[in-house]
Amino acid sequence: MLISITEKCRMGCSHCMDDAKADCDKHMTEEIFRKAIDFNLKYDASITITGGEPTENPQFWKFMDILAEKISKKSFIAVTVCTNGMNFTNDDVYTIRALREKAGTKNLFLFQVTHVPKYYPIPIDMTLDIYKEPGVEIADKIKYLQYAGRAKNHPEWNFYNPTGPKCFNFRSMTRGGMNLTTAVTFLRNSGKFCTPQISWDGHIKVGETTLCPNVAYITDSESQILKKIREFKCSGCSHITNNMAAEYKEAIGE
């Protein structure tokens, strides 16, 4: 499950599926962050913090401390913070060490820094000590580029050709009768961590990009959320859904 704590990003990547911008002020508040973490932990043992660029949220490090404190009372929780690393300094090494210590040895607290010079226009000094720190992993490849957001304006990139929208698995499973925990656990065990998504304002989206429409809210009951998902319709990825077989369209109610 994704928690998007901001829609701001200054990197300006042309392949961005969210169309994140530097002048954006859409940041998750502490109140919503606490509710989002509680919601996530209720249904899923995996938490992925994202954005935009999550470190652009003015309360980023405070949020990480809140998160470490919350999971310290639990076991076998996996936290991944997805960042481009542009705001990290060597001083953050000590903060990351403290966060991982607070989270406890029974939990995983990982910072994943994705930096591929081909796609990321602002260079990062990868010789900094922070990028050698345990708990900070470097992703130097992007396996798939999605045809969404700002990326639609850049046909020079090679986009993968999906057989269905990113929301298909989650929507089809919940429409097929799975509850939220069963659906997200099945996805996690299949190596799929990016749906559903909690937006910066507390809304729930069934797709991966911040441009996906809102479906429900984190204070809704599970029965309300499932009902809204089952009744949900979206034409945002019509370039994909229009080419699906009839039985697959029926599986997500399109």
Labelled PLM ranges:
Residues N158-E254:
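Accessory C-terminal segments flanking Radical SAM cores
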Residues N57-F186:
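Conserved AdoMet/S-adenosylmethionine-binding subsite of the radical SAM
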Residues M28, F88, I122, T219-D220:
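Short coil/turn linker and secondary-structure boundary residues
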Residues I5, E53, L110, M126, ...:
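Short low-polarity hydrophobic stretches
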Residues N40-K42, K73, G104, S190, ...:
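Flexible, charged surface loops at secondary-structure boundaries
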Residues R10, P54, M86-N87, V116-K118, ...:
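Short, solvent-exposed loop/turn segments at secondary-structure junctions
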Residues M1-V81, F88-D92:
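Conserved alpha-helical substructure of the radical SAM core
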